[in-house]
Amino acid sequence: MNSHPLMRLLRSRHTVMKLPSNAIKNDTMLPKIIPAIMAGGRGTRLWPLSRATAAKQFLKLIGEETLFQDTLKRVSDAKVYGAPLVITNEEFRFLVAEQARELGVTLSSIVLEPVPRNTAAAVAVAARIVADRFGEDALLLVLPSDHAITVDDTYKKCVRSACIAAAEGKLVTFGIQPTWPATGYGYIERGTYLGKDVHAVQCFVEKPSLEKAAALLETGNYYWNSGMFLFQAASIIAELEEHAPDVLSAVHAAVRGSTVDADFIRLAPESFSQAPSISIDYALMEKTANAAVVCSDFAWSDLGSWDAVWKNEEQNADGNVLKGNVTACNTKNSLVLSHTAHLAVQGMDGVAVIASEDAVFVGRLEEAHEIGNLVKRLAADENTARLTELHPTLIRPWGGYTTMLNGDRFQVRRLFVRPGKMLSLHKHFHRSEHWICVKGTAEVTIEDRVTILHENQSIYIPEGAIHRLGNPGKIMLELVEIQTGAYLGEDDIIRVADESRNEMPDSRRTGP
């Protein structure tokens, strides 16, 4: 295994950190925590903004950053945390890389799951990679990427307490002090007190009915299951070997057979697909005798519905959250959001009105958690399925594009290319393209001819012509692309050359 290029990559520049024998009494001697951020998912609960190609962790819902970026900032203290490991999928890989780049965050690795296999396999992947890179005594913090959390002294204290328990071999989960009888979360019953706000886990409870949730809340012994975990890599691997060996063996084979592609680690598809699709709670946490819970009371929300977004945003005097291009009249207790067309809402109470570039959702906030049923109905209809799959804006290594208009035999897009980046050299069989430079400078290659486009200039790319677009300038390049032809699908493309990092040669860049 050591000879595999991935293993050499993982072990390079790092030393194994051993835990001092007195670390349980002195938490200042604990090793750095290695965050493993779970950034997969399908993107259905906050439709129409979240889609299969853009899950809610990549949306700016609370504050100026996306939820994924907020998660990265939460583990940015280099005195406490090592570089984060991100587990995601093929569809989200460029979003992960781009949003980390925007913050200036260096990721340890971006690991791509070839197929979704739930959280047990994802946690096993993170544990195996962290053990190989940092040593089996390394502390692993597993975080969902789509939660809203206030990082204050209470939060930091809970993480320290979890570290101390994890260093003793406990598999620690974070239980959130419930503030209402929620039916959308699982619950954890606390058991024997272990010290420093940590209890043994007595049992896990499935998402309850409203009546049962109220009864659990009344006891004072139950906490919401946050889906956050902290443990030593060795501990979780040993427990998986005992309680979920089929998950662990498939993951080990997938890591051993993985390949490194540019900035991504691609798990071996055949091996990883053999892993059962099961949550870490079912596979392990409900079976192990070493489960512990940190009883936490920091501000937390999984933002799992538009109702949750409304509750977590600052409301005006009418109880409204108004974001973007919106006007509300005689409306209260509502969430109205649009960054595209102007939304005007009148005489409404307790509703969510959400507009994306190509769809609008209107529904009662109290029923917003049931939006998944609506998305399934849309996905089952061939006329609306694309509204659940494709987000109008897609991010690529070179920049990205937004689809502005679709029609019979034509499509209009806004392209944006980062400085020094270029697209692959390619051609289309069924469409021609017009490019209009709106901002910046474009280098356009058509067959053997290279043309420089400035603002307000345009160029035509005939059907079947080999072509490429690059940005040799120092500012973002923006173009309007008009496609015309009999077929405009994304699979009508033949790549002639595709530079792995989409970088322009230094000799063709402008400026010093």
Curated annotation (Swiss-Prot):
Enzyme class: transferase
Single GO BP term: GDP-mannose biosynthetic process
Catalytic reaction(s) noted: alpha-D-mannose 1-phosphate + GTP + H(+) = GDP-alpha-D-mannose + diphosphate
SUPFAM superfamilies: Nucleotide-diphospho-sugar transferases, RmlC-like cupins
One Pfam family named in its UniProt record: NTP_transferase
Keyword Nucleotidyltransferase part of the UniProt annotation: yes
MF GO annotations: GTP binding; mannose-1-phosphate guanylyltransferase (GTP) activity
Transmembrane segments: none
Enzyme Commission number: 2.7.7.13
Superkingdom: Bacteria
Swiss-Prot/TrEMBL keywords: GTP-binding, Nodulation, Nucleotide-binding, Nucleotidyltransferase, Plasmid, Transferase
Family: Belongs to the mannose-6-phosphate isomerase type 2 family.
Name the record gives this protein: Mannose-1-phosphate guanylyltransferase
Annotated organism of origin: Sinorhizobium fredii (strain NBRC 101917 / NGR234)
Gene: noeJ
